[in-house]
Amino acid sequence: MKEVEIKGDTTVINANAFYTPEGAYLEELLKRVPGLEYEKQNKTMTYNGLPIHEINVNGESFFGGNSTLALENLPAKLVSKIKVYDKRSELEKITKVRKGGENYVLDLQTKREFNGTLITSAGIGIGNNDKKETELISNLFRQKGDNISVIARSGNRYKTSRYPDNRQDNVAMNFVKKFSKRFTLYGNMMYNHYASGNESTLYSEQYLTTGNRYQNSASTSTNRNTMGNGSLGMRWSLDDKTYFNIGGNFSKSKSDNTSDSQQSTSSEGDERINSITRNSDSKSDSHSFSVNADITRVFNDKGTSISLTGSYSDSKSTNESHSLSETTYYQLESSLGGDSVLYRNQYQHSPSTNRAYSVGINLTQPLAENLRLQLGYRYSANRQVSDRSTYESEVYQDSLSNYTQSRTYSHELSLYFNYNGKRWQVNTGVQMHPERRSLDQKTGLLYADTVRTSVNWNPQLNVSWHQGKTRFELNYDGSSRQPDLGSLVSLTDNSDPLHVTHGNPSLKAAYSQNFRLMGRNTRLGLSGDVNFSNTYNSQTQAVFYNLATGGTETYPVNVNGNWNMRASLRYQKRWKKRFNLSARTGASFAQSVALVNEGKSEEPDRSVTHNTSYNANLRLGYQPKWGGFDLQGDWRYRHATNQLRSTSNYTRSYNFSLNTYAELPLGFLVKSDAAYSFRNGTNIKKGEDDQVVWNLGASWRFLKKKQAELSLYWSDFLSDKKNYYRNVTATGLTESRTSQIGSYFIISFKYRLNKQL
């Protein structure tokens, strides 16, 4: 089998063509697949620019789509092939009608030699900086789809902030059992407890025509969360023409958070505007459950069918927060002649409930051998209640409290056409959503209610063509969106004195649309895409600045002119089964519109920002039988301009990395990954512009079948890691930094056992 093949709308990747170190997990394998990119920090994954939503194993869902559990716990040696495709729901598979929306998945196919083998590993580790870890991982997969997995982990190996009590504990189980060709039961359960904390600083600049504004803040925060969730479902073919699917899930979580912060705002010339000292803590408790079901009856061999659908969900949550703050306004004079100071000792209790249900019917009718039509109707209802009670120094405050109750009743009428030929596939449809929404809201002593009827539209089009190793696809997706009911009510929320918000009953519905063209040829190793999106009547916040206090007042408004486009081109080449070359380049442009008022006029001014970015990536890999080398270079440039303020900013960043490993005699393995990062641009200081992060590892596998492993991992060997996050726009810039523990090591012992069942 070749490294990459296209079969219809499915891309098949030969996992055996990409070598990984002995004992590596799935994440290590995917790093070596051209076109696959995984951002570990934000847990997102893409393949040739397409977002991957979940990981499946042998066609079945794995932990309800929790990709992180698969990436960090599935052994790479299990996988023979990786399929990438747009996964359809069970109802869409039965009716053979695609109803829009994308759900790209990685479907892992396990090797035959591991079919029916229980693969278990257990390990323990300890290191400096109070590092520790324990784990137990057990997987059993059968190629027909049956599987069971148990994962238990505890420790703080990858926690790098300075908080001493960092820890995460996970226990999870997933199973799929096919009792027959007609009946399948599947489910999962997960428990997660984590404690984390951060010491961070934030610097921001805001560019105003009346003079720039600068803000510095420092904070210490802790977070503790305990969560449990699970799901259970079944697929049942009552006979050859009747299909029933039902699934449900539940979750329960508790959290406890604290934060201590100091913040100071000044203008040009270092003239102080305000300063805030705040201590806060909050607790939350929530639980929810939902159930979905559908039943389909096929009437003839052509595929004429009728489907009934239903769903119900219920959730409740309670939030409690306490905040003690002192705000000093240096530009306002108090009655005693000094600076004005606002003290607040505020407690909030905020319970909320959300309940929704829906019922629907779909009629599917084949019009020709490859052409199907589907008519659908669905009725849904939703009720939400939230009640925020605010107390100031233990005295109830009407003006800072808020009660909201909303109801939504909607109808969905849908029409879809699907054509599925040998080379062409066309899926098109439109949804119409008439709805009635009502809102009762009380803020302080003011009461307001509103009722709004509207119609939303959602047209969709997907056209694809493929021949041999070439595939093109065109997508269009449009949707109208009504403004949030709370934004339509003319009430004021001043619970935060520096960020006061208002409503606007004149808001209009927004309409967003997205066009995307993709192309790929596996023989040439080329792929690319072009995207364009824009929004009519986009909702944004008109911002009024109070130059004396440094605060803002906002209210929602509609604006036009928001649009963006981007394009990317990728190249992949593999030769002699050892060398791999991949390259990527791209560019994007975005225009965003806002309304701002800096106190110079009654009406806000139109502020237009242009963001332009370019990127390029080059990667070269060499994989001999005894190891691997991966050299990568990355360049990114971003430039932003604002027409109202005539300001301009840019950020340029470079990253070079080298990942290597070598398998040595007697079961030894050494590995190293090093990355050098450098950046320059607007207001980037010397000493904060570069870093070298070098991680080292070594392991020894011993005993008769190499079941035991002793390993050493040394993170950030040079203790040079800097955790910076920077965002630059034409209206200003923000940069945050989180303190790191620096270099640390951990020594681990692991034992593996494979048993054929």
Feature locations, PLM:
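Membrane-proximal, glycine/serine-rich, low-complexity loop/turn segments characteristic
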Residues: 2-260, 280-319, 353, 360-382, ...
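Signature of Gram-negative outer-membrane beta-barrel scaffolds
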Residues: 373-466, 475-476, 645
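Outer membrane beta-barrel transmembrane domains
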Residues: 391, 395-396, 497, 503-508, ...
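Outer-membrane beta-barrel translocator domains and adjoining extracellular loop/strand segments
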Residues: 95-96, 161-164, 197-213, 257-274, ...
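Outer membrane beta-barrel strand-and-loop segments of large Gram-negative receptors
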Residues: 218, 358, 400-404, 412, ...
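Extracytoplasmic loops and strand-loop junctions of Gram-negative outer membrane beta-barrel proteins
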Residues: 65, 90, 119-121, 211-218, ...
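Conserved C-terminal beta-signal and adjacent last beta-strands/turns
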Residues: 615-634, 648-757
